[in-house]
Amino acid sequence: GRTRDESPRGYGITSGKKVAAVLRSIWNLSANDNPYADWILVQVTDRVGELRQQLEHAGKHFQDDLDKLQARGLRVSVLKSRAPVEVELGFRSPYGYMIVDLILDFDWYARVVKTMVQKNRLGDIEGKEDLYQMTKRIRALFESTLPYQKYLLREELRLLSRSDFLPGASDEARKRVEAAVGIFGEVPPPIFTGEVRPRHSRRRADVSEAEMRLLVDVAQGKVDAAGSDLNQENTLL
């Protein structure tokens, strides 16, 4: 990554280390039973999985081409650094290592593409375009995590939890819900009820059957924050 001042174009590049720190913060928020933290972690995990599949598929296509050269008698090795740098890594959440996996996959893919260019299997422009498009997708993912940390870690939203959405919640809780929904939209029902969960979460709340039914009703819009049944006919009409 680069800071805004270090970038020749005047904008910063979000590093994998920065994204790992953002995801650690959101992972910590999941301990508060925060549905938006769960939603973000699920989204990022899914997108990382998709990107890794794309890297594997595209890289394998190129690798197969190189293997054909070897079958014809030309032994080709994928490029690697003459002086590889060893870095000791340590992350305080599983999501840091998830980002490392993505970066490792991209590093391998980039070396395969550069090998293809060097061995005349791809042209210079094709190779640069392939790397540019893949880099663009990964950067888009990295950049997309920043607003979540910016807003969810604010003092006004830091205490947000599923209980804020339930009937009888305090005025402060309702304000947190209104702000979160206004910024991020409604949490998908499967995330809100816990049917779909992050791969790694600090959530430890045990939900009773009655509480689960209430969460489902709120997620489906059957009950409002005041506890009213929204399907009930209004007798004043």
Question: Where are each of the predicted segments found?
Answer:
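Non-transmembrane amphipathic alpha-helical segments
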Residues: 106-116
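Conserved hydrophobic residue
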Residues: 121-122
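Short, solvent-exposed positions on alpha-helices
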Residues: 125-126
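Polar/charged low-complexity regulatory segments
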Residues: 1-102, 108, 134-237
